[in-house]
Amino acid sequence: MPMNPALALQEAMLARLRDDAALTNMLGGQKVFGRPPRRTAPPYVVFGDPETRAWNTFTETGHEHRLTLHVYSEHGGRKQAYEIIARLDELLDDAPLPLTDHHLVNLRCVFWTALRAADGRLFHGILRLRATTHPLQ
């Protein structure tokens, strides 16, 4: 059974981010997570819940994905959050990521911001991406 395209995309993105020495240095270690960590000190990056829609036609099948990466920064504040977002953008925008059982047609960063979190001590950076995939034949 082929891998779910959203999971294949998240796996490839996670591998790309974890393999980058500059991002690892910015985060102070391997702090890119598929789900929110417990008791991990900021800064760190967490994948949000993906949204996937079919874009099938009479001749082709495929999916559109909307993904969100969350960046949490404390002492470095908004500046640190934006620096991490900029690195994520460099690594992911139009990246030729290899996917299991699927082909990545495109991957684009479409929105980013950094806001003071409700607790007043953290900054919450948000990076949204859009991707399209189709299954390998």
Spans of features found by a protein language model:
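Residues at secondary-structure transition points
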Residues: 4, 8, 56-60, 75, ...
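Oligomerization/assembly interface segments of phage tail-like spikes and tubes
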Residues: 61-75, 123-134
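Mid-chain, well-packed structural core segment of small domains
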Residues: 71-94
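Acidic-leaning, charged glycine-interspersed low-complexity segments
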Residues: 90-137
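Short beta-turn/strand-loop junction motif enriched in small, turn-promoting residues
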Residues: 52-55, 74, 114-115
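A generic structural signal for short beta-strands and their flanking turns/coil linkers
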Residues: 28, 41-43, 63-67, 103-105, ...
